[in-house]
A protein has these predicted regions:
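DUTPase catalytic domain/fold
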Residues: 1-401
Length: 401
C-alpha cells in the first residue's frame, strides 16, 4: 500500500499550486503515463499508433472498419455487452454495416454505433472518461463513448477490460469519415494512490489574481464568482465593438457534406456570419447551431487539466459546448508564466424555445483538476495545436475568412 504524503509540495519552481510530481499521485494521467499504458498493453490497438495520437492529457480514439446505423440511442446496462445489446435491438444489424475502409458518408439526423480501434484493460485504481475532439464539436457532431456494461455515456469504470464503441450523430452536416478518423478522445484518472494536494479557496484565488487561469483583466469578476477549482465564463457578443464585425456563426441548412480529411472548405458555403450590432445580444432560435466565443482569455497551466462542464439548465434554455477537454498548456504564455490570449470557443444550440443571449452573460463553467504528473508535452508549445491563441475560429476543415 502506498503511504500518504501530507507534507506540502514546493511551488518555488513554477509559481503554481504544488506542482505535480512523479509517483502514484491521484489525478489526470499525462502523456508519459499514457505511453506507459500502451507499453503494458493496457491500451490495445488493432492497427499501429498514429504518431500524434497521444495528447498532453489524453489519447485520441479512432473509428474502426464498420459503422452500424441504429434506430435509437442506447446504453447496454450492467452485465450486457454493446454488441449483444445491438443484436437484441436488431438481430440483423450486421447486415447493414457501412464499410469505412475507403471512406463513407454518415448522414445528418442519423445515429450510428462504431467499434473503435482501441480497447483498454485498466488497473483497479484507474478510470477513464471521454469527450469529443474540438473539431467534432465545432461541426455539431454528437459523439458519446459506450463501454460494455455501461450505465452512462463517456464513462469507463475502474478496472474495465474490454472493447470501446462510439455513438455518432451528425446534427448540422453530413460528414465523410473513414477507418482511423478521430472523433473523440479519452482521459485517464488515477483515483487512488498518494494524494496530490487539493485546491484551497485561498490558493485558487491566488491563481486567479496572478492571471494564471484567466487574463488578469477578467479576474475581478471571476474572483467575485469564486468556486474553488471552478472558472465561470461568459459569452462575447461585441468583439472589438466595431459595427459589422463577425462575432459568431450560425450553421446553414442544407449545406453539402463535409469530408473530415479536407482543410480547404469555404466557410460561407456552410456558415452564416453573425455580426455585431449595438444591442450586444443574440436571439438563439430553436434547433439552430451557433459558434460563439468566450469574453475571457483563459488558460490551463502545465500542472492542470480542465473540462467544460455539461449543460446546466440554470444557465438558460440552451446547451453550450460539446468538446469539454482543455489540455495542459492551452492558452498558456510560458514566457510570462500566465494566461495568454486564447478564448474558449462555444458550440451553442438552443432547445425548445427562442432564448435571448446577452453580451457578458455567464454560460458555463470550467472545472480544473490536478494532473497526476506534469506532461512532457504541452498544448500549443510542444505539439501542433490547431486552436492555440485562438479567438473566434471554426473547425480546422474550413479556411480562415
Amino acid at each position: 500500500m502506498n503511504e500518504v504524503i501530507t507534507k506540502p509540495d514546493s511551488t518555488a519552481n513554477s509559481g503554481l499550486i504544488a506542482p505535480a510530481r512523479e509517483g502514484d499521485y491521484t489525478g489526470i494521467l499525462p502523456s508519459r503515463k499514457i505511453k506507459e499504458m500502451l507499453n503494458r498493453n493496457e491500451i490495445k490497438m488493432m492497427i499501429n499508433l498514429d504518431h500524434d495520437q497521444v495528447q498532453p492529457a489524453s489519447i485520441d480514439l479512432r473509428l474502426g472498419d464498420y459503422a452500424y446505423p441504429v434506430d435509437t440511442s442506447f446504453l447496454p446496462g450492467k452485465g450486457m455487452k454493446v454488441l449483444d445489446k445491438m443484436e437484441q435491438l436488431d438481430d440483423r444489424f450486421t447486415d447493414f454495416g457501412i464499410d469505412l475502409r475507403k471512406g463513407a458518408v454518415l448522414e445528418k439526423g442519423r445515429v450510428y454505433v462504431i467499434p473503435l480501434l482501441e480497447s483498454i484493460s485498466l488497473r483497479s485504481e484507474v478510470a477513464a472518461f471521454a469527450n469529443p475532439k474540438s473539431s467534432t464539436g465545432r461541426l455539431d457532431i454528437l459523439t458519446r463513448l459506450i463501454a460494455d456494461g455501461a450505465t452512462s455515456f463517456d464513462q469507463v469504470g475502474e478496472g474495465y477490460k474490454g472493447e470501446l464503441f462510439i455513438e455518432v450523430a451528425p446534427r448540422s452536416f453530413s460528414v465523410v469519415v473513414k477507418t482511423g478518423t478521430r472523433l473523440n478522445q479519452l482521459r485517464f484518472r488515477r483515483t487512488r494512490g498518494v494524494e496530490a494536494r487539493s485546491f484551497s479557496a485561498a490558493e485558487w484565488k491566488k491563481l486567479l489574481d496572478e492571471g494564471k487561469i484567466v487574463d488578469s483583466s477578467d479576474h475581478e469578476k471571476n474572483a467575485r464568482s469564486i468556486k474553488t477549482g471552478m472558472l465561470p465564463f461568459t459569452v462575447d457578443l461585441e468583439g472589438s465593438g466595431k459595427e459589422g464585425e463577425i462575432i459568431g456563426y450560425r450553421a446553414k441548412k442544407h449545406a453539402k457534406r463535409i469530408d473530415l480529411e479536407r482543410r480547404d472548405y469555404d466557410p460561407l458555403n456552410f456558415w452564416e456570419p453573425i455580426r455585431f450590432h449595438k444591442t450586444s445580444s443574440l436571439i438563439l432560435d430553436p434547433d439552430e447551431f451557433y459558434i460563439l466565443m468566450t469574453k475571457e482569455a483563459i488558460a490551463v497551466p502545465p500542472d492542470y487539466a480542465a473540462e467544460m462542464l455539461p449543460y446546466d439548465t440554470r444557465a438558460g434554455e440552451f446547451r453550450v459546448h460539446y468538446a469539454g477537454f482543455f489540455d495542459p498548456g492551452f492558452g498558456w504564455n510560458a514566457k510570462l508564466n500566465k494566461a495568454g490570449s486564447s478564448r474558449g470557443v462555444l458550440e451553442v444550440r438552443s432547445h425548445e424555445v427562442p432564448f435571448l443571449l446577452e453580451h457578458g452573460q455567464t454560460v458555463g463553467w470550467l472545472r480544473y483538476e490536478r494532473m497526476a504528473a506534469r506532461p512532457e508535452l504541452l498544448y500549443g508549445q510542444d505539439i501542433s495545436s490547431n486552436y492555440q491563441g485562438q479567438s473566434l475560429k471554426l473547425a480546422k476543415q474550413f479556411k480562415q475568412l
